[in-house]
Amino acid sequence: MAGQTIIVSGLNPAAILQSTIGGGASPTAAAAENGTRKVIPLSRDALQDFMLSIITQKLQDEKQPFYVLDLGEVVSLMDQWKSSLPNIRPFYAVKCNPEPSFLSILSAMGSNFDCASRAEIEYVLALGISPDRIVFANPCKPESDIIFAAKVGVNLTTYDSEDEVYKIRKHHPKSELLPRIKPMFDGNARCPMGPKYGALPEEVEPLLRAAQAARLTVSGVSFHIGSGDADSNAYLGAIAAAKEVFETAAKLGMSKMTVLDVGGGFTSGHQFTTAAVAVKSALKQHFDDEPELTIIAEPGRFFAETAFTLATTVIGKRVRGELREYWINDGLYGSMNCVLYDHATVNATPLAVLSNRTNVTCGGSKTFPTTVFGPTCDALDTVLRDYQLPELQVNDWLVFPNMGAYTKAAGSNFNGFNTSTIVTHLAYTYPS
C-alpha cells in the first residue's frame, strides 16, 4: 500500500496531534526524520489557506492532485459515534479508504477494523494492531485468505453459505462464525448489499445446522443494510430478524451467542443521528434481555467521507459560446470513480491561483455553465455537467470536499494515470 504511516497514540486530541508531529516538536514544526509526517494544526476555516500553501510549494511544480486528511474531523466523528452509540464498538471498513495515516488515528481512538481480504488484514496488522481487533467480514473468501487468517489469528468471520462452512472447517476450525442474514428492507441504500450477500430466512437454520455439524463455533449474527442507507428504518427490521436467529440457535441447542454485528450504512450528519436513535430503539426492544451481548458495527463512509478533501489542477480548457469545458488531472477512472460505483455527487470549488490571485475563490465573479472532464481518453470520464463555475485558466485548481469514501481506494491506473500515487497531506483542524 502506497504512502507513509504516522504513529498516533492516546484518546486525547492534543495527545494525538502531539504524537503525529513527533514528541517535543512545536505544532508547526516538521516531524522528526523517522518516517512520520508533518501535521499542521489549523482553525476550521483555515483549511483552504493550507491547501493554497501546498499548491504554491515547490513540491507542486508538477501540479499533481493531492488529498488533505483532516485529523480533527476524524476526532470529531469518533466523539459523535461514542456519544450516540456508546455501547457499539466500531470496526472501521478498511475497503472504504485504507490510507495508513487514517487507519492509525482510528486505531488510536479505539476503532477496530472490518477487513474483506488478506491484503486488508495485512494493512491493519502492519500498523501493529492485534488480530483480535479484526472481523473478516467477507461471507465468501478465497481458501488462501482463510488459511492466512488462521495463520495470523484473525478468528471472527462471516458466512452465508454451507460451502463457506466447509472451507472454514478445513482451513480454520478455530474460527468464530457470524452467519450473515439478508435484511428484508434495504431502505434506499446507495449501494444495496442484499442482491449479493445474506441468508434468506429459510436458509438460516440449515446454515446453523451446517456449522453445528462441522463443530464450528457460532458466536453471533451479522447483517448489512447497504452502504449509504438513507432510511434508518432498515435497521429496525434487520435487528428483529437477528433476534430470531439467536432464538433459532438456542432451540438447536447451540452455545449461547454473544455477538451482534449491525454492519454499516452509517453516514455522518442528520442520517447518523436518526440511525443511532433507530438502532438503540431496536436493540432495547429485541436484545434488552442480553446484558452480556457484544454489539459491533462496520462503519466506513461515516468516518471517511468528510475527512478528506481532493485538490485537482485544470490541465485543459475549451470555450464553446457560453459553455466552458475544463479538463482536470483526476477523474472517473481515479478518485471520482465514486460517481459511477458509489452513486456519489461531487461538488467543486475553484482556486484560481493563476488567473485571479487577488480573489482565488472567485467570490462575486460571473459564472458559466461548465463541463469538467477527467484526464483519460474515455468520453465517459466526465466529472461534472451543467455545473456553474467562474472563468478559469489552465493551471488553476478545482477542490472537491467530502472525497474520503470509496474514492482513491477504488481508483485505477487506466491510461497511465496512477491513482495510487496521489499524495495525502495531514492537517488537524480545531473549531473556530
UniProtKB/Swiss-Prot annotation:
EC number per UniProt: 4.1.1.17, 4.1.1.18
GO CC term (a single one): chloroplast
Xref: PROSITE patterns: ODR_DC_2_1, ODR_DC_2_2
InterPro entries, per database record: Ala_racemase/Decarboxylase_C, De-COase2_C, De-COase2_CS, De-COase2_N, De-COase2_pyr-phos_BS, Orn/DAP/Arg_de-COase, Orn_de-COase, PLP-binding_barrel
Description of pH dependence: Optimum pH is 8.0 with L-ornithine as substrate. Optimum pH is 6.8 with L-lysine as substrate.
Regulation: Repressed by alpha-difluoromethylornithine (DFMO), 5,5'-dithiobis-(2-nitrobenzoic acid) (DTNB) and salicylaldehyde.
Catalyses which reaction(s): L-lysine + H(+) = cadaverine + CO2; L-ornithine + H(+) = putrescine + CO2
Domain of life, per lineage: Eukaryota
Effect of C96A: Almost unchanged activity
Cofactor: pyridoxal 5'-phosphate
Location of this chain's protein in the cell: Plastid, Chloroplast
Residues binding substrate: Y341, D342, D378
Positions contributing to pyridoxal 5'-phosphate binding: S227, G265, E298, P299, G300, R301, Y406
Family affiliation: Belongs to the Orn/Lys/Arg decarboxylase class-II family.
Subunit composition and interactions: Homodimer. Only the dimer is catalytically active, as the active sites are constructed of residues from both monomers.
Listed name of the protein: Ornithine decarboxylase, chloroplastic
Organism, scientific name: Nicotiana glutinosa
